[in-house]
From Swiss-Prot:
Species: Arabidopsis thaliana (Mouse-ear cress)
Protein name stated in the entry: Hyperosmolality-gated Ca2+ permeable channel 1.5
InterPro entries xrefs: Csc1-like, CSC1/OSCA1-like_7TM, CSC1/OSCA1-like_cyt, Csc1/OSCA1-like_N
Topology in the lipid bilayer: Multi-pass membrane protein
Pfam families with a match to the protein in the record: PHM7_cyt, RSN1_7TM, RSN1_TM
Record field: compositional bias (Polar residues): 746-756
Lineage of source species: Eukaryota, Viridiplantae, Streptophyta, Embryophyta, Tracheophyta
Length: 756
């Protein structure tokens, strides 16, 4: 079990590591050769030019202005200087609201920490319960926790009052933040520039028709049922094979660029390659000619495949993007049932074109339920099997367990410095390593489930990651760690005493989570700003592949916030903070340092680095709110169970009302604010349409929407325009009959539609 000395060693290691990362970043960002790595967002916006083009030869690679090194930490105040409205214009609402999650943590935990250290720590410290318990492993730092309060003590009333303070304050902050972000979302949508998704809905599960193709059926259906507002449609094609060919060609082009650059450095020698297995065997040929030939052949295949996709009705997917003349028409269509059969002609608000995950649009809609069931089972087993490495991590936090497993290492382990390193630093870094591959696995699972937008993929992945963190990192660490630390106590006492030992031991797991917070939340966040991996990859690409300025821009990897991994990780800190605030407040300062440091670092990254792939207008906030509420309820239930083992019979029943009040609060927020994040108000749509009609009376909306939702691999294809030509019915008139290939079918008792 980690002692105060071990925590001090871990803090020293992580503080020095974080400081080293900041120093390295401050120096690297000043070098002209790294400018595109640390400021890619400004290059993508066209607001920054390369400093390599100016100055002497040495100044193209190294910053020779020594005065700039004196101000090497000025990036911190610069990151905080940009006001929030300007930041929304610069980076989008998603990025700004993501930053507000860190502010939410500071708003919740700073007042709680002040109260806890003023009231709770003296109450816990001024006891000697742990000293009187036999066969119990503890350290001095555990005397600051509720474990040091004797069984049946009246001091538990203080912890009860603290639980009420935590609950009411957290709910108050959550409600104000929910209200503010809902207002920000409505204001953002009202002031946003015209975008294709504002006029478009995605229609799925289009029923097959023997007389008409999907394209003809879509046009006919919406001309008949939305005659006044329907404008045009974009068919959805299964172009996955074409995408694979395009990706393959891009890889071949990279190899061609590499060998052409190599040849340009040494024109007297043509580069050669072997065309056998892995380039190690086979005939030796001219590399440039070889790749030119392969690219030409693949280009012909791409052209043929594109023609096949565009001309074959089998490539059409039973889905379409349908656009309307006004936002009002799109709102009505997306929020109403289109057919008597509620399983057909399903409509939803279309994601913006950047947000679409095209590979999943080709999946049959009927498969989605089966796919999600399969993934649910797979996720259960993934969570179960990951308990093994989590249990292994807990053995690292227990010196006695390591010494029993490998007794020959006991002399080395007992060295004070080594012991402090193992207990204070190694468990946190080991857990971090085991979790590295998890986000990639969860993203693959989310893609298999069939979500059609990147934002929904990230939200589902975040949901899975959160559940995994809660079960394995939080619960499993507590249970396994308690069992390993108090194994001797379990074996030498009666069964009736075991719940008491568990009740005492759970608060004592705070030391393990402190080490994890320092590794992940301190050094990990500092490592994010260094961008070591993108730095190396950029320079490798710049040396081997880049020939033009366009190539250099493509070599930049600005990255994104990474909501699917970042938000669940933040939620783990909310759980830890709320659970341990009333039982072991020593955890709170470490969490506050994380929230403050992460806010500054990620604000800098959002301003200078990250380039979001999509904009959802903070649609993820209901998930954030719900998970904080779950963390609050978990903290109440655990405190309830903890006090029951402490025989606090008079105070424990008063905790039962807290989960009920918290659930009621969540239901209120869900009914009051969540609809704003799910639907778009008709009133706002009409206002925006009216203003646009007054400002731009001659707007040609069809031209604006014509190729907005064409698949990226053939978005510029001219022959798609023919499918977009639609006659506009005259306003305020009875719609003309729409031509159709369908035969006459009179409705009678024998032809009634069946519902499946």
């Amino acid at each position: 079990m980690a002692t105060l000395t071990d925590i001090g060693v871990a803090a020293t290691i992580n503080i020095l590591t974080a400081f080293a990362f900041f120093i390295a970043f401050a120096i690297l960002r000043l070098q002209p050769v790294n400018d595109r790595v640390y400021f890619p967002k400004w290059y993508l916006k066209g607001l920054r030019s390369s400093p390599i083009k100016t100055g002497g030869f040495a100044s193209k690679f190294v910053n020779l202005d020594f005065r700039s090194y004196i101000r090497f930490l000025n990036w911190m105040p610069q990151a905080l200087r940009m006001p929030e409205p300007e930041l929304i214009d610069h980076a989008g609402l998603d990025s700004v609201v993501y930053l507000r999650i860190y502010l939410l943590g500071l708003k919740i935990f700073f007042p709680i920490a002040c109260i806890a250290f003023t009231v709770m720590v003296p109450v816990n410290w001024t006891n000697s319960t742990l000293d009187q318990l036999k066969n119990l492993t503890f350290s001095d730092i555990d005397k600051l926790s509720i474990s040091n309060i004797p069984t049946g003590s009246s001091r538990f009333w203080v912890h009860l009052c603290m639980a009420y303070v935590i609950t009411f304050w957290t709910c108050f902050v959550l409600q104000r933040e929910y209200k503010h972000i809902a207002s920000m979302r409505l204001q953002f949508l009202a002031s946003e520039h015209r975008r294709p998704d504002q006029f478009t809905v995605l229609v799925r599960n289009i029923p097959p028709d023997p007389d008409e193709s999907v394209s003809e059926l879509v046009e006919h259906f919406f001309k008949v049922n939305h005659p006044d507002y329907y404008l045009t449609y974009q068919a959805v094609y299964n172009a996955n094979k074409l995408s694979e060919l395009v990706q393959k060609r891009m890889k071949l082009q990279n190899w061609l660029d590499y060998y052409q650059n190599k040849h340009s450095r040494n024109p007297s020698k043509r580069p050669l390659i072997k065309i056998g297995f892995l380039g190690c065997w086979g005939e030796e040929v001219d590399a440039i000619d070889h790749y030119i030939e392969k690219i030409e052949g693949l280009t012909r295949k791409i052209s043929e495949e594109k023609e096949t996709v565009m001309s074959s009705t089998k490539s059409l997917v039973p889905a379409a993007f349908v656009s309307f003349k006004k936002r009002w028409g799109a709102v009505v269509c997306s929020q109403t049932q289109q057919s008597r059969n509620p399983t057909e002609w399903l409509t939803e608000w279309a994601p913006e074109p950047r947000d679409i995950y095209w590979d999943n649009l080709a999946l049959p809609y009927v498969q989605l339920t089966i796919r999600r069931l399969v993934i649910a089972v797979a996720f259960f087993f993934l969570t179960f099997f990951f308990m093994i490495p989590i249990a292994f991590v807990q053995t690292l936090a227990n010196i006695e367990g390591i010494e029993k497993a490998v007794p020959f290492l006991k002399p080395l382990i007992e060295v004070k410095t080594v012991k402090s390193f193992i207990q204070g630093f190694l468990p946190g870094i080991a857990l971090k390593i085991f979790l590295i591959v998890l986000p990639s696995i969860l993203m693959l699972m989310s893609k298999f489930e069939g979500f059609i937008s990147k934002s929904s993929l990230e939200r589902r992945c975040a949901s899975r990651y959160y559940m995994f963190q809660f079960i394995n990192v939080f619960l499993c660490s507590i249970i396994a760690g308690t069992a390993l630390q108090q194994l001797d106590s379990f074996l030498n006492q009666s069964a009736t005493e075991i719940p008491k030992t568990i009740g005492v031991s759970i608060p004592m797991k705070a030391t393990f989570f402190i080490t994890y917070i320092m590794v992940d939340g301190w050094a990990g966040v500092a490592g994010e700003i260094l961008r070591l991996k993108p730095l190396i990859i950029y320079h490798l690409k710049n040396f081997f592949l880049v020939k033009t300025e366009k190539d250099r821009e493509e070599a930049m990897d600005p990255g994104t916030i990474g909501f699917n991994t970042g938000e669940p990780q933040i939620q783990l800190y909310f759980i830890l903070g709320l659970v341990y605030a009333a039982v072991s407040p020593i955890l709170l300062p470490f969490i506050l340092v994380f929230f403050a440091l992460a806010y500054v670092v990620y604000r800098h990254q959002i301003i200078n680095v990250y380039n979001q792939e999509y904009e959802s207008a903070a649609a993820f906030w209901p998930d954030v709110h719900r998970r904080v509420v779950i963390a609050l309820i978990v903290s109440q239930l655990l405190l309830m169970g903890l006090l029951s083992t402490k025989k606090a019979a008079r105070s424990t029943p008063l905790l039962f009302i807290l989960p009920v009040l918290t659930i009621g609060f969540h239901k209120f927020c869900q009914g009051r604010y969540q609809p704003i994040f799910v639907t778009y108000p008709l009133q706002d749509a009409m206002v925006k349409d009216t203003l646009e009609r007054m400002r731009e009376p001659n707007l040609n909306l069809k031209t604006f929407l014509q190729n907005a939702y064409a698949h990226p691999v053939f978005k510029a294809a001219d022959n798609l325009a023919n499918e977009m030509v639609v006659e506009e019915p005259a306003p305020d008139k009875t719609p003309d009959l729409v031509a159709t290939k369908r035969g006459s079918r009179r409705f009678n008792s024998g032809s009634a539609e069946t519902f499946t």
